[in-house]
Amino acid sequence: MAEKPQQKAVASAAKQLAKEVVKLDKITKSNGKQHPQKNVPARKWRPRQAKPNNRRVTHKIKRELHKQGLEGPASRFRVTVSATIGKVGPNKEQGPELQIATFLHPSLVKEPNDGSNFGPLQAAAAQWGLWRISDLEVRFTPLVGSSAVTGSVTRASLNLTQSPGATSWGGLGARKHLDVPTGVSKVWKLRRGDLTGPRQTWWVTDTNEEGGQSCGPMLEVHGLGKTTSTYKDSDWTGDLFIVELHGTWEFSNYNAKPALGMLERVTDQTNVELGVDTEGQITMTIPENSPMARHMGERFERASASNASSVGETIWQIVDEGAGLASSVAPAPFGWLIKGGWWFVKKILGRAANAGSQYLVYASLADAQNGKPAMSTSRGYVREVKQTILSSTQLNAPNTGPGASQPALAAYEMFPYFPHGEPAVGQPFYLMSTVSTGVYREAMPVWVKYNYPGAPSNQAPFEVTIGQTTYQAQTYFKLTEPVAYGADIPEVTSEVKPALNGWYTLDTLPAIGTFQAIFTLPGTKSKYGDVVAASHFSITPQLMLVAYLVRVTTALPNALRGSPWSDNADNSILYYTPLVNAYAAATSDANPIQFTPNRACVSECRSHCGHPTIVAADVGEYILALVWCRGNGFSAGVINSYGALADTSFNLDSLRADSNGVMTLLNRAVPYSSLCALRMTRGVPPTSDDELVARILGQLQTRLKFAAGSGSSSEDDLSDDDDFECLRSTPLQQIYEGVRGLRGHAEAVAVVKSLQSRGHAE
């Protein structure tokens, strides 16, 4: 039967539709495999797909994160700095040894012994309340080549917990770390994600806040393996690396707290003693007068009206850089804490300081802030003192504002202040020391006159030579570690306050004369020292005492040798007592001692007073040679109209004020030592008038640009050696001062007379 027309039309349409579906399916599959069709021309009208803009995408992501508050406030201030945080030294043992442990807080990133120096990071930390690190590089610069040492490797690791732990070498490797072979330069790059803070990537700047919110990550550097030298069979003693940080710190939320910019850091070699107190708390004790104890002293603590024992508020991070404290010297069960190499302490206030400064030990920063010291189970722990190198870092300041204690905090930085430089020529300085009488008999000080046969009369066993003139010294005094300082101290009450202006060393002072002595008779005098400074006191217009500071160059013996010192039959050696008021001796209470107030004498001792004792002095030590003589003037160590004394008694109408302190040397009895302070002057007198005139003219030509080659007016081109310095204490220096003020021509004689009339000449 034939098909109907309608059925044929439907079948044809279905067949055509099936062909289109198969065709479309082939095209879809072909486009999915991205196979180019052969013999099919490309469609020029089809647009290419645009590549994504990574910069735009990053910007959109950051904007979205900022909208959702995931990154906190925007950065308001950025500082990029390079800071040295320490050196990596050699390993003394095989096990891991801590070399450096430092927080990355901007107030704490500073060099060892940097004190409270105010750098750009510290300045920013004192002004902003939030901080973070955008990028950081830890640079290891080798200080020795790889061929010179062997046996050690260094590992830097990042500790994000703000507390030490019992970490092995494998445990350090489980952290984010970098291994540095010896002698190789390395750079460790850390990104923001490694250093992000807990407050939407920010850290709090105030270290009085919770430690986990403020101090930031901890960078630790350990060494493994004993460091030995390849050049000789011995341990290596030098440093291996210098470690520097180079990074960018960002800050936000302005909140000024000046004290946070002055947190201190000190490294010192000291004795450390770990112990357990009566309550079972672990304590650390260091010597009271050590630099470390002064650094961690009570000046940072709040003043308390009570004298009861308490614990300070300032927290200190202690790092055992010397690896001198082994776990065996720590009370159980905290041997791991000491072995880890760093911990926290607070000072114990109000306790007796006989045994040293004591501190409570804490195992973490959080424990220190919450007042939970490490407790020991070893109540019978035996204390043991060990010497090591400790690094102490101040982590917080109880007073963060510019309070009254702040100036004292800043002023403290000048101490300890070590001597440097020399007192200027002609400018007075003060000498302070304990003194021991050089010549004495039991409790009586002795002066000696020396009239040995064949020698001039009125001589002494000691003498000082300045230029061409020799002065006889009747005794001397030994100084113990003398100190020299410059100060402006008014002689009378005035509105001008005393001021300290120098702290000098004596060892480099040039000699202005020589000191000779004789200790063995018969014999001749020989040189025993150099004279470097002098002081004087005029008792009357014609009578004076002069003290010369002598640096010993040949050791002084401890005894006088030779029979003439004690067997004084020919009366060649005379012994005297120091200056006293004249008196008439009494034999009973009915006839008391009678003094003559206006008459002083140097009393002669009986010949049988016995062999005197002398005090020895080693090379490099200092003595004071005392000259009792006639003279009417004194300048730069030179005594004008000098004359040796033959008389022993003098009339005194009035006693002048002794502003130089020379009379304090005239003690009536010999103590073991006494404290003495002298006002002295150093100076080099010219050897002749011709030389003086030539030096003055030469200096005038140089300063007034008369000399050849002196055309430059820069002060840097002038010589550091001032020829006038040696003349400032001489009367002729005053001549120059007078000439300098004259406009016209004047003869020298008229200038001298003019100065004398004005009272400038001595």
Curated annotation (Swiss-Prot):
Query: What domain of life is recorded for the organism?
Result: Viruses
Q: Which segments carry the region annotation Inner core?
A: 67-259
One Gene Ontology biological process: clathrin-dependent endocytosis of virus by host cell
Keyword RNA-binding: yes or no? no
According to the UniProt entry, which residue ranges have a biased composition of type Basic residues?
41-56
Q: Which InterPro entries match?
A: Astro_capsid_N, Viral_coat
What is one cellular component GO term in this UniProt entry? T=3 icosahedral viral capsid
Q: Does the keyword Ribonucleoprotein apply?
A: no
> Could you tell me the keywords of this UniProt record?
Capsid protein, Clathrin-mediated endocytosis of virus by host, T=3 icosahedral capsid protein, Viral penetration into host cytoplasm, Virion, Virus endocytosis by host, Virus entry into host cell
Q: Residues at site: Cleavage?
A: 305-306, 354-355
Which residue stretches belong to region Disordered? 25-56
Family according to the record: Belongs to the astroviridae capsid polyprotein family.
Spell out the protein name for this chain.
Capsid polyprotein VP86
